Design a protein with these regions (language model features):
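Transmembrane helix-loop junctions and nearby membrane-interface residues
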Residues: 21-28, 57-60, 64, 144-151
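Membrane-embedded hydrophobic alpha-helical segments
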Residues: 1-38
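Amphipathic, membrane-active segments
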Residues: 32-74
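Terminal, low-complexity, charged helical segments
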Residues: 1-6, 15, 49, 53-66, ...
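An amphipathic alpha-helical interaction surface
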Residues: 77-212
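Amphipathic, well-ordered alpha-helical segments in soluble domains
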Residues: 17, 24, 50, 108-111, ...
Length: 212
């Protein structure tokens, strides 16, 4: 009788250990799914806020490119960064290369690049590439606008010392080269925005947000 009792005790202990292990593994899997869901949701909300900015200011991305210096570039920059995540960059475009605004600008660009990489890692399929490319193009557009604003600032400073025509100042600082780079960046951003702005694309992404 004691022999059978020991046997069943061993069996019950083994079953209890197995159940505990199963529950532990299940809890880990659920925890991992929750963490993945949280990461996906956070990145989705951030990129969606930037997409909304591009939607609200689509004319800046699609308007006819003028063959003259863009003296309102700083205002365009502010419009394209006018949300709670990006608004700290307003001072950066108003005071290019000045601290602490310049460091804040560099940090935010790095955050955007990191977000683009993270998007590819936590979302599946080609859909992730569309969004990561959009983030990279957005970051590159801000960089081009910032670089162009430095040129505009130098043109204004030069003109305050030695008044010249706008055409002369443009030639002196190779303004057209930077303007062309700006236009190219804006065109790429428009194309990548058009890709992610499609309803079917967003629906595919939202399906991956479901916690299962």
């Amino acid at each position: 009788m004691l022999k059978y009792w020991n046997f069943w005790c061993t069996v019950m202990t083994s079953i209890a250990a197995f159940i505990a292990l199963y529950l532990s593994v299940r809890q880990i899997k659920l925890g991992n799914k929750q963490q993945l869901f949280d990461r996906r949701l956070k990145v989705y909300m951030l990129v969606n806020s930037i997409i909304s900015l591009c939607k609200e200011n689509y004319t800046l991305l699609s308007e006819k490119r003028e063959a003259e210096p863009q003296l309102t570039n700083d205002f365009s920059f502010i419009y394209l960064t006018n949300n709670t995540y990006m608004e700290s960059l307003a001072k950066a475009i108003q005071y290019p290369l000045e601290q602490p605004f310049h460091n804040e600008f560099l940090k935010k660009r790095e955050d955007l690049r990191s977000m683009a990489v993270e998007f590819e890692l936590i979302f599946k399929g080609n859909i992730s590439l569309l969004y990561s490319n959009f983030l990279r193009d957005y970051e590159q557009t801000l960089a081009a606008m910032y670089q162009y604003q430095i040129v505009i600032k130098r043109m204004k400073e030069e003109n305050s010392k030695y008044p010249r025509t706008l055409e002369e100042l443009s030639q002196l600082f190779s303004e057209k080269k930077f303007r062309d780079s700006l236009y190219e960046a804006l065109d790429k951003l428009r194309e990548s925005y058009d890709a992610v702005a499609q309803e079917k694309v967003e629906n595919k992404l939202r399906k991956q947000l479901v916690l299962i």
